[in-house]
Structures are given as C-alpha cells and as structure tokens.
Amino acid sequence: MKNIFKTMLTIGIIKKVILVLVLLSTSLNAQLDRSIMPESGPAPEIFFGKPQTFNLDNGLTVMVVENTKLPRASASLSFDNPLIFEGDIAGVSSILAEMVGNGTQSISKEDFIEEIDYMGASLNVTGSGAFAGSLKRYFPRVLELMASAVLEPLFTQEEFDRQKNLIKESLKTGEKDVGTAADRVESFITYGSQHPNGEFISQESLDKASLQDAIDFYNNYSSPSNAYLVIIGDVNYDEIKSKVTDLFGSWNSKEVSSSSFPSPNNPDETEIIFVDMPNGVQSVVSVINTVEFNKKNSDYFAALVANRILGGGGAGRLFNNLREDKGWTYGSYSGISESYKTKGLVIAQAQVRNEVTDSAAVELLMELDKMKNTYVLDEELNSAKAKYTGNFVLSLENPSTIAGFARNIITQDLPEDYYNSFLENINSVTKEDVQNAAKNYFLTDNTRVFITGKGSEILESIENIEYNGKKVKVRYFDKYANEIEKKLLLKFKSLRHI
C-alpha cells in the first residue's frame, strides 16, 4: 500500500511539473513572435594583444604577441612588395611559388618534409612569404627550418621544368573552359595589358621564362627591408628576439624596385564585353567596375555591409533572385575587393543557362541599381551585421588572421585600435550609410557587363539588351582578350556549322 501511495504521489508531482511547464511555454509563446527577427545585441568586445615590435639591422620588422593560452606558436612572414608586372615572362612567379619550400640548400626535400611531419608541424613557403606553426616545444626548430627555406631556397633546373610543365598542362586543360576564359578576359579588359592585374600566363610566356629568371625574381623581391615577421603564441619575447636575430640577422637587404603602370579606368558609359565560347553550355555573366577602395575609406564598413546584403552569401539578394526565385543558376554572388596599391573591384556575377543569359545580365544591373535607389530592409541590415560578427569572431581562432591584422596596421597606416573597434564600426552602419556606399561604389552607369558563352545561342539576345531605355553597346573579343569585329565573329560562327 505504501508503494502504491508513493507511486501515486510521484505521478502527481510529475503532472504538476508538466502543467507548470505547459503554462510557462504557452505564456512565452504568447509573448514571442517567431516571425520577427530578434534585435541584435551589442557587439562583443574584442581586444588584441598589442605586439612588441623590433627591427633587425637589415630592416626586417618583427612583431611578437605573447599568448600562453595554449602550448602552441606560429610565425608568419610576408613581403609588402609593390605590384609586379612580369611582362614577357608572365608566369615566372607562379613557377617560383611551387618551387620554394621544397627543401633548402642544406636540407634535402625528403628530409625537410619528413622532419616537419615528424613534429606534426605545418610549414608553407611561397614566393610572397611563409607560415609555420607547431607545438611550443618544436617551435624553435620549426623557425630554423622556416629561416633556412627563406634564406637558402633550393632552386634546381629539374624542379623548375617540372613545375613549368604542370602549369602548361593546366593551361591546356582550361582551353575550352568558359570560366577560365571569362576570368582572363575580365582581368585583362578591366585593368589593361600593362597592369600587373591585367596580364595573364600563356604558353609563350612560359616558354620564355628560365630558371635564372625565377632566381632573379626571388632575389629581387625577397628582401628583409620589405618583410614583416609576426610571431604569436606561447613564446618569451626576449628568447624569440634572440632567436630571430640569430636566424634572420644575416639576411642581406636590398632595395625593392617598383614599376609604374597605368591606372585602370571605367568606360564612359555601360558596355557589354562579349567573349564567344562555342562549346559553352552555360554563360558567365559578370558586372564589373573599378573603385578606389581600402580600409582608410570613411565608408569602408558601410560598403562591406552593402556588399553582404547584395550578394555576400546564400542570403544575399542576388542569390535569392537568380537562384531561389528564378532557378537560373546554382548561385549568384557579389564582391568588393580592396587595395592600397591600385584600384579594387566591384563585381556581381552568375553562371547561368544559355537561354537566360540576357535576362541574367539585366537582373544583375537591376539589383545593383536597387541598392542605390532604395533603403535595405531592417532584417537585411541586422542579418548582414550578425554574419560579419560571427565570421570575424571565428576568424580570430586562426593565428595567421591575427598576424595579418598586426601587419595591416603597420603597412596600411591604420589606427592601433582598428581591429578592436571593427565590430563596433560594422554595427554602427545605418540604412542611409548602406545606400550612400552603394551610390559611391556600384557604378552601373559606367560599368562593363562581361558575357562569356556560346555566341550561336546567345548573341542575338545580348545585342538587344536595354539599360536605362537604350540598347547597350556590345564589343566582341576572343578568349585571349583580343578585340575582333562582329563580321569576323559571324564568319567563325558560320564555319562551325560546315
């Protein structure tokens, strides 16, 4: 009887608890409208340890951030070189990037890789710098290997020829690829043939490049006077300073030469650049204009938010329009690239079916215009800010990100608290700020609409595209960015049907 009473008492208590939870849930649901996005909370406060900085006699700038949270350390070396125009030997830097880091003059490639693997470390060396990371106990040795790879790179004719041939094969593979042709022509036309960002690698330029060219390129542009070494992690400043001085102090400094090149310009009025790819089953449509855009711009953060709302991801307007609503593409995105050495780019892009190529081009222009002519919605603004906050916080887990922040503050002359206040600046952006930034950077009246695809199926409709009440001028190019006459294009078109 006692057991029955206890059981009944327990059941009664459980029923009361359930009743309370149901009533509480009902009350909460009555107060919470799930159709309304909750308001964003305050931006999390971010504090970066201020690096301790010193310079070696050869000009190498070293920044050390002590962080004993985990028994790990990393080193990031980068060169703040000017943009480099390679000219007749375009591609030599690409060959070089694959050669460095594969052993040194004192350590064979096999021994080099084996030792890195044994320590469970990472060491990546390219023509523009190096990154290394490991557990604390291995870090001194990893730093030694990094210094050896940078100061005593191993360049052999055999490895040079191997890497050159790999790039040649890659070029052959991309001969009929619509995306590859689009990228090449877009860069060339946007920046120009004499601009480092406009030149492209060809079989001919690779044939002209020699091993000595690669060695000269490395020696000319790998100088401590233009280099920054950022060390982060469980290290002691005095010990690291002594170690770095021993390893990098003998590195010979030299003046890094820079070349002049014309500044890219936008067209006087919007135009279409058409590139015929006879085998294309889809078209690449890109709306591109150049902009003066870097971290010191007063509307920098507003422009970032504007781009996020337009096409910075799967929640962007371009994606929702061309993918979710119309089903024309697997994805449509936008970007705004920054540079403190030349002009950056605004790009809105989609890869679509041939039959909707002209319509996609019009929709991209319309979405860009909409950003300029109307305010974004509150939920779009809040979502963009939340996405930036999440991405920014997650990025801080990567030591190379922190190293990049420290380097940027020096090379771009930014305030010391620039990244500490990054999220605050993002969250202070208003709808008015977004619209003004769109007006400043989304230059739909002076832009190029690049369309790369199968002319026999899309050219007629492209030539009838209208913008602002009049037909858009069309210019014709081959896949190597050579401008051609329409009649020549039509001749090739007729020959394909013979």
Regions found by a protein language model. Name each.
Residues 9, 32-35, 39, 113-217, ...:
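Acidic/histidine-enriched segments that form metal/cofactor-coordinating
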Residues 15-26:
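Bacterial N-terminal signal peptides
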Residues 32-40, 228-294, 453-493:
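An aromatic/glycine/proline-enriched structural segment found at the starts
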Residues 35-54, 188-227, 259-264, 293-295, ...:
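Histidine-acidic residue clusters that define the catalytic metal-binding segment
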Residues 75-136, 196-200, 312-328, 340:
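M16/MPP (pitrilysin/insulinase) zinc-metallopeptidase core fold and M16-derived inactive scaffolds
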Residues 103-106, 134-164, 294, 337-395, ...:
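M16/insulysin-pitrilysin zinc metalloprotease superfamily fold
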Residues 166-185, 263-282, 323-329, 374, ...:
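Short acidic/His-enriched helical or mixed secondary-structure segments at domain edges of catalytic enzymes
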Residues 286-288, 310-352:
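A structural supersecondary motif
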